[in-house]
């Protein structure tokens, strides 16, 4: 019986000692810090779940907005390609002209003797030049007939050709059979866009008995409002051409100018004093006396 009482009192004492002791004798039974960490991890896992759902919604909306942009880009490309290619169809030939910085067009024009014809074009251009190509025997020859800019207008009279030009057209009046041929216009914009157009003019007799009043050729001479140096040089050249001075007189004047220049150079050299070619040594040379001693 005594040993039963001893065991009972021992258990009671151990129980009271455990109640007053706040330490954890065994790490496997201690749950104070573990409980706190578990609650924290549960809170974190709950916060992660809504975040993942929000990201998936943003991804879905971005994909939906990207699809229309791709369709719009495809429309722009197709529109640019269709506006870039210009097709010209003739009776026996089809050619495609692409609007690059240099484009060439060809037109067939028919005119009647004694009447007039207009070779016109559209668009805003900065520099216009008209050329006339010769007869079939002169395929590679061209003659400038007109140059027009915003502040400059000049025509080159060509035989019996009656014409006038401006920034949008070339007017040929009082047509004759000799006016048949090719007329080429070269035009340039401010952005260096270059374009050529060839007009093949065929002049024939009209099927009419009416009398056509011939117009007098009122060709415009040089009308220049620009005062730059290169335009002044053009005036000088045109004046010399109109003077029609023989070549012998030009040679005589050139010889006189060269002779005067040579005489001026010779007289200028004679006025300058000549420098001596050597320097005289003194009679007494100290170096020579030193060597003798």
From Swiss-Prot:
The keyword Transmembrane helix applies. It is found in: Virion membrane. Gene3D superfamilies: Immunoglobulins. Residues 1-19 form the signal peptide. The keyword Signal applies. InterPro entries: Ig-like_dom_sf, Ig-like_fold, Ig_sub. It is a single-pass type I membrane protein. GO terms for cellular component: membrane; viral envelope; virion membrane. Its main location: virion. The chain crosses the membrane at residues 245-265. It comes from the Viruses. This is Membrane protein RL13. The gene is RL13.
């Amino acid at each position: 019986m005594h040993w039963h009482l001893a065991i009972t009192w021992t258990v009671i004492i151990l129980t009271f000692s455990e109640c007053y002791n706040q330490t954890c004798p065994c790490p496997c039974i201690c749950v104070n810090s573990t409980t706190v960490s578990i609650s924290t991890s549960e809170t974190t896992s709950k916060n992660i779940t809504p975040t993942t759902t929000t990201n998936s919604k943003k991804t879905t909306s971005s994909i939906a907005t990207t699809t229309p942009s791709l369709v719009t880009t495809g429309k722009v490309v197709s529109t640019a390609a269709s506006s870039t290619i210009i097709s010209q169809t003739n009776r026996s030939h089809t050619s495609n002209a692409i609007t690059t910085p240099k484009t060439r067009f060809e037109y067939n024009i028919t005119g009647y003797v004694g009447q007039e014809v207009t070779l016109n074009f559209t668009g805003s251009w900065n520099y216009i030049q008209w050329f006339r190509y010769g007869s079939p025997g002169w395929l590679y020859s061209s003659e400038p007939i007109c140059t027009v800019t915003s502040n400059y207008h000049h025509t080159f009279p060509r035989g019996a050709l009656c014409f006038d030009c401006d920034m949008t057209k070339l007017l040929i009046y009082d047509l004759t059979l000799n006016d048949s041929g090719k007329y080429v216009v070269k035009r340039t914009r401010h952005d260096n866009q270059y374009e050529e157009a060839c007009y093949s003019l065929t002049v024939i007799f009209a099927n009419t008995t009416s009398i056509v009043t011939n117009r007098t050729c009122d060709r415009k001479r040089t009308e220049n409002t620009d005062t730059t140096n290169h335009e002044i040089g053009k005036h000088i050249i045109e004046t010399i051409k109109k003077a029609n001075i023989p070549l012998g007189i030009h040679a005589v004047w050139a010889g006189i100018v060269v002779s005067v220049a040579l005489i001026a150079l010779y007289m200028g050299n004679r006025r300058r004093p000549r420098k001596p070619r050597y320097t005289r040594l003194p009679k007494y040379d100290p170096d020579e006396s030193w060597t003798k001693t």
